[in-house]
Amino acid sequence: MSSPLQLPNASEPQVLEHLVVRPITEDERPLWNTKVADHHYLKNATLVGEHLCYVAEYQGLWLALLGWSAPARHLRPRDTWIGWSKEQRAARRHLLANNARFCILADPHQLPNLASRALALCTARLSADWQERWGHPILAVESFVDGQLFRGTAYKAAGWQRLEDTRGFGRVAEDFYVRHDRPKQLWVCALEANALEVLRAPQLPPELARFERQPPPPRPRCRVPTGRLVSLLDILLDVLPDPRHPKGRWHPW
């Protein structure tokens, strides 16, 4: 991991006042990936589904990196916080985003408030940027914090709310989870004052109704009763002749 960036000629108030948070350009993505892989404890910059990458910079110097991606599919504390139904979650989950990567490149002792400032500036513009890139707004955000490594102070200072910790499972396939026994802090934040009311409303308001998605059709299920299901091997043994010539001694099974 690289050493924290030092700013010997700048005070924290000066840096925070002139801090700029913006989406990275396509040409900057390789550098962003490299720095995230170098500084983030997960050691990779992979983002799932719809996503946006940001940099917080001061006079052209990259001080922090933020990555947003699709939210978790099933998250009981978050779903309880919102108060939506399973059907509403399926149709509106894309209106949430997950702060999947957050790296501070500058010395946190020199700039202790950089993280919360960068986070606040980023969430202030996230919905508009998301709509420009992905065609719909973001109403609320979530993030997981490894409590064994971090305290979540930046999220608290930026106005986020901590819910109960996760149960220590990680998704390893489309809808398959395994226990890793490392529960995470769950932090959430509504980007609009009425975001939760909108997400759990029977109908979205007219200006948001066009963003509601139709749930996918149910997966086809086998309609053959269990008693009628037989082994494919048994069928093949009855149909296909054995090409081997009987030789040697036969032994009973």
Model-derived segments and their meaning:
Residues S2-S3, E197, P206-L208:
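Active-site- or DNA-interface-adjacent structural scaffold in DNA-acting proteins
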Residues C222-W253:
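Short, intrinsically disordered, charge-balanced linker/junction segments flanking boundaries
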Residues A201:
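C-terminal functional segments of enzyme domains
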Residues R22-N33, A37-C53, Y58-A195, L204:
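Acyl-donor binding region in acyl/amide transferases
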Residues E12-L16, K35, T46, P243-R244:
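Compositionally biased, charged N-terminal/linker segments
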Residues P205-L233:
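Short, cationic low-complexity segments
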Residues M1-E26:
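Conserved N-terminal entry element of GNAT/NAT acetyltransferase domains
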Residues L16, I24-D27, F150, V224-G227, ...:
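Short coil/turn linker and secondary-structure boundary residues
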